[in-house]
Structure formats: structure tokens, C-alpha cells
Amino acid sequence: MADSRRVIIASWYRTFMGIVNLFGLETKTCWNVTRIEPLNEVQSCEGLRDPACFYVGVIFILNGLMMGLFFIYGTYLSGTELGGLITVLCFFFNHGEATCVMWTPPLRESFSYPFLVLQMYVLTLILRTSSNDRRPFIALCLSNVAFMLPWQFAQFILFTQIASLFPMYVVGYIEPSKFQKIIYMNMISVTLSFILMFGNSMYLSSYYSSSLLMTWAIILKRNEIQKLGVSKLNCWLIQGSAWWCGTIILKFLTSKILGVSDHICLSDLIAAGILRYTDFDTLKYTCSPEFDFMEKATLLIYTKTLLLPVVMVITCFIFKKTVGDISRVLATNVYLRCCLCRCHAYNGKCQAVYTSSHCESSTLRRCRLEAWLQHA
């Protein structure tokens, strides 16, 4: 999974070497290190001409550019430069918990992380604008590919992203046409990653790919689901249940058909953390504290930097607004189902289709009046 990262950086290294050789620039310094006999002297080098230094340098450059991207992202979300500055400061204050690039720069996630931030910014841009411009969608596809190629766990992060966007689509926060384009771009990015990884079947048998296929199917059957005649809440529950069950079933079916066995399964890591299940692969990951349960010191650090309190306050506001919006939609839907009547012009009469003892007579009278005015 990491070969693509090395291939890309190797191509950049050869391009860089061609440029510095063309201009005769000296970007490498070497010296001999004397060691105690019987060990011989060894040469040690630093500078961008050295492949190892170039590799680490590229990682640090990408993460440096990410700071500028955080500023742009925060400015766009808040509408002011102050918001971008606060975003960067919050990242600095929580730098030790947000990334490990300063300790282990060669890690695959250190290379992918900047592209994830770019992907989130592009996705936010798409969700907040109503333009039909294709360039943001193309940028979303390319940033997805750049994020997935170096890191095998990127698909799980994108899966959680789709799992967050799908309920927003179901309850009506995202336009169906826009959400359909987002799903198409994600499907194209999976296909491109599959091709660029020389046919790695893990991309096609992941939860991410299965969720995309299920989302696409539910979007196509949206009208049929709405014609079932059920309430709004039941319609949401049907789509949500179909998405979850279909994603899990499709994931296991594609794994069986393609004969793919993940070298490390997310369910194994969860079982290792909760049930203390162990094997060679889980021990390889869980020996690191990053994959263990959150320590109490971590919560204390988040509180000292005000990250945890601010996130909790924002989460409460979002939850309150979401519950209020959903309650209003459900209340309106129940009222309409109770009082809706189908009016047709036949001697100026109105035939009630959905009525009950709870319907207001004024609503039925208004329906008859509107029918009479239309066909008078």
C-alpha cells in the first residue's frame, strides 16, 4: 500500500536532481565519521540530494503547507481572517495530539494528512455553494486519490465521512443532485486508486466502497421509497437501516468474491481493545499507546488547551439545532398527512383522502375553497 508514496516521491526526487544538476547547485554535505576499531569509517550526508533527507523534507514541506491550508479553511468557515488565525493557533496548542510528524515523519499518515485537510476543505466548499462548477468536484476526486494512495487506513476515514453525509442527505440538509455528484466523485476516486495500485482488490472490498454502492442504490430508489406511503420518520429509518445492513453485507460478499483477506481488520482492533482478543497483527498495532484506550492525561491536555470544552459547546449547539429542525419537519409531515386532501373539480366538491378525527375543519374548508377558486 505504501509503494505509491515511494514512487511519487522518487519521481519528485529525480525531477529535483535534474534541476539542481542543470544549474550546478550544491545541496548535499558529507563527512566521514570515525568509529572505534575494528569498525571502519562511514560517510554521513545531509541535504536534499540525499534520498533519506529528501524524503523527510517532502513530508515536512507538505505539513508546513498544511498550516496555510488550515488558515484558509478556518477563514472560509468563519468568514474572517481571525477565524483562520484561531484555527492555526488551536492546531499549534494541540500539536502533540493532532499529529506525530515531528517524531516519526516517514509514517504513511504523515504524508496523507495534508491531503485529508485539503479534501475536507473542498468538500465544505461544495456543500456550502450552489454553483454548478465542475472544478470543485474534480478537486474532490483528486484529493481523495492523493489521500488514499499512501495510507491503507484512509478508506476507514472516508467511510466515516460518507456515514456522516448520508444522514444529512436523508433528512434534507444536502440536495439530492449535489450528494449524487459527491458519491460519483468518490466512486471515481476509488476506481483510480484501484488502477494506480495495480489492481489492489482491497479498495473494492472495503467498507468505503460498499457504502458508496449502497448510497448510490438508495439515491436511485429514492422516489420508490417515498411512494411507500409511510411517515417521514419511517422513511428515514428505512433508508438508514438499508444503508447499514447493505454496507456490511456487501462488504463481506465482495471480500468473499474477490478473495480478499485484510492484513489487519478494523473489527479485530476493536475486539482487541474491548475483548482483549490478540493475534500477531493486533499485537503489532496495539503495542503502541496510540491504538490503546484513551488515557486520562489526554483528556486533561484537551481541557487545558480549551479544545474539549469548545468542542462540547459546539456539539451541543449543533445537536440542539438538528433536533429542532428534525422535530419541525416531522411535525409538519404529520400535520399534512392528517389534513391533506385531494381536490378535484366535480360540481365544486372536494374529496378528502387523508383525514382523521384530529384534522381541523378550517383546513378542509380552505382546501375546498382553493379547489373552487381553481376550477370556478
Curated annotation (Swiss-Prot):
Gene Ontology CC terms: nuclear inner membrane
Keyword annotations of the record: Glycoprotein, Glycosyltransferase, Membrane, Transferase, Transmembrane, Transmembrane helix
Entry keyword Protein biosynthesis: no
Tissues in which the protein is found: Fibroblast, lung, lymphoblast, spleen and testis.
Carbohydrate-modified residues: N32
GO MF terms held by the record: mannosyltransferase activity
Bilayer topology term: Multi-pass membrane protein
InterPro entries for this protein: Dpy-19/Dpy-19-like
Subcellular compartments: Membrane
Transmembrane segments: 52-72, 107-127, 154-174, 182-202, 233-253, 299-319
Enzymatic class: transferase
The protein's Enzyme Commission number: 2.4.1.-
GO biological process: spermatid development
Function of the molecule: Probable C-mannosyltransferase that mediates C-mannosylation of tryptophan residues on target proteins.
Family: Belongs to the dpy-19 family.
Name under which the protein is recorded: Putative C-mannosyltransferase DPY19L2P2
Organism name: Homo sapiens
Species classification: Eukaryota, Metazoa, Chordata, Craniata, Vertebrata
Protein's gene: DPY19L2P2
